[in-house]
């Protein structure tokens, strides 16, 4: 009996060593293919943005490549991005957008992606992002007089945007513009003024003929614009400087018919954003906030000074393929280093990659 047990143990050990465990291989973060996947991920972010500003790739932090059955492989990617000066509605190509500098109170994004590579094609399976402005301490060390981001719901910000849009409409020979979103604001100490950036939408009214703005409707072919304004506080009056850039009209996208199989979802048009939605705490899905019949109350969201990328993908489920893929990043993996021999010594992982602009 003892001999049989010993033979059984030896056979089980043989099976364990004979069958290779599923593992990933680590990838050079500055490898051309890794950069290609990262740029695809950034495009995915910007294509889903309806508010805030476009982001650009700053650094690739980590790349893991998982095998997938029956074919293909999945890139698990961590990247850093930086906010640009191009609004999400601005059709300017990302390559022509300037990165917002540290002295302008830069915003950094942190994103996790899973991207499928199959038959030479890349497809985003899942995305998770958040973004954070640079700390006030770091900015003031570099530039003591630089204004910081101001909460978008500040009364002075709302008044400045309204005053700037009113001033622009009074001199505008085209369509009457309505406010869509206050995107960014700063309180400038000297001279005392409020700097604000906001988006607008054209209506079916002529600006100089409007008597009742409530009767003006947005155009069927949506046409948006982006405005920058400085409203200075003078004695008994305000001094307004405002410029607006109107983008080409967007053609109407056909709405999916109810009950039609395979109908594609249409992104909603941007809307006025008086308050940001409450996001679930880190590590919790929206469904986890409900325990039996009891709804767990959430604290009100703090005033925000920028559009957090977390809201772009909030509530969006993972799109990981259910076709029997061998992709389990939650399990303890076997790491396979590419082109690494069996020689003893520490393995140097070529990650994180290079910083393309600056790190905050």
UniProtKB/Swiss-Prot annotation:
It is found in: Secreted. Residues 1-15 form the signal peptide. Its main location: secreted. Residues 260-285 are annotated as: Disordered. GO terms for molecular function: cysteine-type endopeptidase inhibitor activity. The modification Phosphoserine is found at residues 131, 135, 318, 321, 323. The modification Phosphothreonine is found at residues 132, 312. Phosphorylated by FAM20C in the extracellular medium. The keyword Disulfide bond applies. GO terms for cellular component: blood microparticle; extracellular matrix. Keywords: Cell adhesion, Disulfide bond, Glycoprotein, Phosphoprotein, Repeat, Secreted, Signal. It holds the Pfam family Cystatin. GO terms for biological process: acute-phase response; cell adhesion; negative regulation of bone mineralization; positive regulation of phagocytosis; regulation of inflammatory response. Bone marrow. A cell adhesion protein that binds immature cells of the granulocyte lineage. This is Alpha-2-HS-glycoprotein. It comes from Oryctolagus cuniculus (Rabbit).
